[in-house]
Regions:
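C-terminal alpha-helical interaction appendages
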Residues: 1-68
Length: 68
């Protein structure tokens, strides 16, 4: 299920990832969702791809996500 806005993201992402990181996650997830439409693991793959995109721009220091 694609996310239309950042408000639709899982609460753990909304509460811990900066807004720009949420944008990256949402856009990447939605793109991967379309790319893997025929894969039975579509949602799992889309989440992994989206997290990888966030981790290219941000890193987690303690409990905070900060720009690299």
């Amino acid at each position: 299920m694609p996310y239309l806005t950042n408000d639709d993201l899982p609460i753990s992402i909304r509460h811990h990832v900066p807004e720009h990181g949420q944008d990256i996650f949402r856009q990447t997830f939605n793109h991967a969702w379309q790319q893997y439409a025929d894969d039975p693991r579509q949602e799992e793959i889309a989440h992994r791809v989206a997290w990888a995109a966030v981790k290219r721009v941000y890193e987690k220091l303690g409990t905070e996500w900060v720009p690299r």
